[in-house]
Structures are given as structure tokens and as C-alpha cells.
Amino acid sequence: GFFLNALKNFAKTAGKRLKSLLNHASCKLSGQC
């Protein structure tokens, strides 16, 4: 119940953060920031 939902939310948030970090890193590498 609660614990599983918290875990899902955490995974979702972590995924979003990781994605934006990767996007930022790749735009820095390609010099398009």
C-alpha cells in the first residue's frame, strides 16, 4: 500500500531528475546549451 506508492513516487521523481541531468550533460557536451 503506502510503502509501494512511496517507492513508485520516488522512482518517478528520480527518473525525471536523471533524465534532465542527462539532457543537460549531453547539451553541454555538444555545446548547444
Swiss-Prot record:
- Summary of the function given for this chain in its UniProt record: Antimicrobial peptide active against E.coli (MIC=5 uM), K.pneumoniae (MIC=10 uM), B.cereus (MIC=7 uM) and S.aureus (MIC=12 uM). Has very little hemolytic activity.
| UniProt source species | Euphlyctis cyanophlyctis
In the UniProt record, does the keyword Lipid metabolism occur?
A: no
Pfam families named among the record's database cross-references: Antimicrobial_2
Superkingdom of source: Eukaryota
InterPro entries hit by this protein: Antimicrobial_frog_2 (IPR012521)
What's an example GO BP annotation here?
defense response to bacterium
Q: Which family does it belong to?
A: Belongs to the frog skin active peptide (FSAP) family. Brevinin subfamily.
The entry's protein name is: Cyanophlyctin-beta
One GO CC term, this protein: extracellular region
Tissues in which the protein is found? Expressed by the skin glands.
Q: Keywords in UniProt for this one?
A: Amphibian defense peptide, Antibiotic, Antimicrobial, Disulfide bond, Secreted
Instruction: Please list the disulfide bridges.
Output: C27-C33
Q: What is its main location?
A: secreted
Protein transport found in the keyword field: no
Any idea where this protein resides?
Secreted
